[in-house]
Swiss-Prot record:
Protein known as: Phosphoglucomutase
Catalytic activity: alpha-D-glucose 1-phosphate = alpha-D-glucose 6-phosphate
Record's cofactor remark: Binds 1 Mg(2+) ion per subunit.
Protein's GO biological process: enterobacterial common antigen biosynthetic process; glucose metabolic process; purine ribonucleoside salvage
EC number: 5.4.2.2
Family: Belongs to the phosphohexose mutase family.
Active site positions: S143
InterPro entries xrefs: A-D-PHexomutase_a/b/a-I, A-D-PHexomutase_a/b/a-I/II/III, A-D-PHexomutase_a/b/a-II, A-D-PHexomutase_a/b/a-III, A-D-PHexomutase_C, A-D-PHexomutase_C_sf, A-D-PHexomutase_CS, Alpha-D-phosphohexomutase_SF
Amino acid sequence: MKGCLATMDKELWIERANDSLVKHFYEQQSDIEQREGFESKLTFGTAGIRGKFGLGEGRLNKFTIEKLALGLARYLNAQTNSPTIVIHYDIRHLSTEFAQIIANVLANHQITVYLPDTYKTTPELSFAVRNLNTTAGIMITASHNPKDYNGIKVYGSDGAQLSTDASELASRYIEEVGDPLQIDIPISKQNTSYIKPFPKSVTDDYMKHIQNMIGYIPKSDLQVVFTSLHGTSVPIVPELLKSLNFNQFNLVDAQCKPDPNFSSVQSANPEDHRAFDQAVELANKSHADLLISTDPDADRLGIAERDAHGHITYFNGNQIGALLLNYRIQQTSQLRHRLMIQSIVSSELTKSLARYNNVKYKEVLTGFKFIAQEIRQLDDHQNMIFAFEESYGFLSEPFVRDKDAVQIVPLIIKYASELKLYGKTLKDELEQIYQTVGRHEDTLFSHTLEGLEGKKKIESIMTHFRSNPPQEIQGLKVKAIEDYLTSEVYHLDKDTTSQINSSKSNVIRVLFDEGFIALRPSGTEPKIKLYVSLKCPDFDDVAQKINAMIFS
């Protein structure tokens, strides 16, 4: 009977394909991909929803977007009288159409919607929520995912992504909508009056906040190459740099045009060195010093440096974090009660640097909303000078409550320009940090373990660490094991336990005098990540051996 219902369901969807906005994508998919759309369901989680285009409740299409919008409308109206919302969208396929659908549904429920007439960045959305004092915000993006993906992120009134509790409540309202093919949403001219133009003054205010943060960029002969990887950071980043009187940059023209197919990049992810290939070519031609890339929604940023001999140095997220923290420490030397916030899987290097400079630090679960939560809870006398995640997400000043590559681009240029005046590079500065606090190094291993066997393997690894805590790993003596699922720390050296004041998450962190390793399974994919952050000789060899020991 279940099979018959599934077949009927599929037939109903196919009958509505012409109205779905995604018929073309569906027709390009394999039989397996098509079937997945009917056999799965998109779920609204702590990061909203993200998925492929296609037919069925497991895919993004006109009907599943209407369901999401209707659930969010009911959720918002249950939270407050006369709710307001701002919607931004990136350059991806159907981002504009999804934004209009959501705006129409919300307006139909007497929710005032601010909707721009062009694409915007994710940090601009976070800023706009705060600037316009709206109840919520929606960002339509799938970050650096492939071209056949899109997604919806929902933000609260503080400009941060919804908390876990709020996400769960919104999810219940969405699920209560039921079958998306049965939704009937009449659009009246009276209700479309709730859709307002997005005020240009908000973008101007955002630019002013960054201009005030940067001040000025000192004159040097620093040359920069910038690529938006076909995303949203052009034109805002070039306009921002020019407003700061910095004109010594070249754009990778082919990649600085919005393109939902990401035609000229192998990867639209600044973590991936391949994302810099065309930037490197241009840097070699123009003899540039600094290469910067942002991901498609401009919340994350990667950098590389070219020396006088044409050698390219790529910096990982932890190294960029250390450089930016070092610079912010220099910039804020007059402030008291300084604070840095980072995720629990980010480097020991930044913590050591903070300690050395008498800057307090806090660690939070992965996900920038947890950093935003800490910012929200700060006392008036505390000064948050920097926050970051090792996955290339950084925030210098909290007028935005999400990762913000737009504010970081001029900051890193200012830093590099100052160094250039003294004949130094970012690589030199990183080496100086290592000499000051020790050579803490980091690497990440990501394992995809498919199917039931893969799931069992992941569970077995996590269970083993919980029930049989190791005394040592590759000659490194274990001090403590932090289990974020039980919110407990087991101190092996004292044979005692203590509590972690944190939300629960399926993460285990093993602490040594030399640093830590962390294990973190994905909640949505058949993946598990191993983070290694250590100060030890032969780091690469030790990290490889730890990885082999755990996953052999």
